[in-house]
Every structure is written in C-alpha cells, then in structure tokens.
Amino acid sequence: SWCDPATIKYVSGLTGCRAMVKLECLGSQ
C-alpha cells in the first residue's frame, strides 16, 4: 500500500518524491 510507512520511506528514499507519495496516498482514500 502507498500509505504503508515502510513503502513511503522506501519510495521517498528511492526517488526523493515523498510529497508525491503522500499525495498518492491521500488521493487513494
């Protein structure tokens, strides 16, 4: 899940786009 903290940490570390991940999480709810 995009909302999973581990996923957010991994993706943000990989792409540097934590804000985008958060937007995806909010948009999916």
Curated annotation (Swiss-Prot):
It comes from the Eukaryota. GO terms for cellular component: extracellular region. The keyword Secreted applies. One of its GO terms (molecular function) is alpha-amylase inhibitor activity. Keywords: Alpha-amylase inhibitor, Secreted. It is found in: Secreted. Alpha-amylase inhibitor. Belongs to the protease inhibitor I6 (cereal trypsin/alpha-amylase inhibitor) family. This is Alpha-amylase inhibitor 2. It comes from Saussurea costus.
